[in-house]
Regions:
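Bilobed "Venus flytrap"/periplasmic-binding protein-like clamshell domains
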Residues: 1-66, 160, 175, 179, ...
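Generic signal for short, ordered secondary-structure residues
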Residues: 43, 130, 171-172
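Residue-level detector of anion-binding/catalytic polar loops
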Residues: 22-24, 70, 199
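Pocket-lining segment of extracytoplasmic ligand-binding domains
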Residues: 10, 47-139, 143
C-alpha cells in the first residue's frame, strides 16, 4: 500500500502540492521508488518539478522529522511499524490519491484501491484513499503441476494462520488473489483456481 506522508504542520494537502518540493521517493530501484514515480507522473509531476531524494526508510524518516524533505513515499503494508514509529517522532498526515488519478493508475499499472482507516496511525484521524500493489508468490515453471497445486492449496488452507503472523490485513481470498495479476499463472495454480470456479491465464 502506498503511503504518502508529510508533516502535520505542512501546507501540503494533496499530491499536487508537491510541485517544487523535496520528496524522498525511496531507494534506487525499489518498489517505493517505482510507485512514487508512477504516482507523481499520473499527477503530471516529473523530476524537474519535484526534487527527488533516494533515502532508505530510516533516512527518510529522519529527513522528514528534520525538515530536509517535505514528503516521503513508502510502499508498505497497513499498520506498518515504520509509519507508526515515524508518527511518534513527529505529527504526520497522509495524503489521499484522487479517484481520477487512482483510476488512471489502475488502468495503466493494475494498482488496486486501498484505504487507510482513520486512527490507523498515531494522530491520523481521517480515512485516506490510496492505491496498493499485490504481493505475488513466484515459482519456477519447472515445478510440477502437482507441487504447485499443493502449494497454492496450502496457502489458502492456512490463511487464518498466516494472518496471525502479521498485523496487516492479508485478505487471503481466492477471487481477490487473482485480481490485477498480469503475469501468467503456473498450470498447477490454474488447476487449483479452476476447481474453485476461477479461470486464470497460463503461459501455455
Amino acid at each position: 500500500m502506498c503511503h504518502i506522508i508529510v508533516r502535520a504542520d505542512s501546507d501540503i494537502n494533496s499530491v499536487h502540492d508537491l510541485l517544487g518540493k523535496t520528496v524522498s521517493v525511496g531507494e534506487e530501484e525499489s518498489g517505493s521508488q517505482l510507485n512514487a514515480k508512477q504516482i507523481l507522473s499520473a499527477y503530471g509531476l516529473n523530476e524537474k518539478m519535484v526534487k527527488e531524494e533516494n533515502f532508505n526508510y530510516a533516512d527518510s524518516a529522519k529527513a522528514l522529522v528534520s525538515g530536509e524533505v517535505d514528503a516521503l513515499f513508502w510502499t508498505v503494508g497497513i499498520n506498518a511499524t515504520v509509519v507508526e514509529e515515524l508518527s511518534r517522532q513527529c505529527d504526520i498526515k497522509l495524503l489521499s490519491i484522487d479517484k481520477e488519478v487512482s483510476d488512471k493508475l489502475k488502468s495503466a499499472y493494475s494498482y488496486i484501491d486501498c484505504k487507510v482507516d482513520g486512527n490507523t496511525y498515531n494522530g491520523q484521524t481521517k480515512d485516506v484513499n490510496t492505491v496498493g500493489v499485490k504481493s505475488v508468490l513466484i515459482v519456477s515453471d519447472r515445478l510440477s503441476n502437482d507441487k504447485v497445486k499443493a502449494l497454492t492449496k496450502l496457502v489458502f488452507d492456512n490463511a487464518n494462520e498466516l494472518q496471525l503472523t502479521v498485523s496487516a490485513d492479508l485478505d487471503i481470498i481466492e477471487k481477490d488473489a487473482v485480481t490485477g495479476v498480469n503475469i501468467p499463472f503456473h498450470s498447477g495454480a490454474a488447476e487449483y483456481y479452476s476447481e474453485k470456479g476461477i479461470e486464470v491465464k497460463t503461459a501455455e
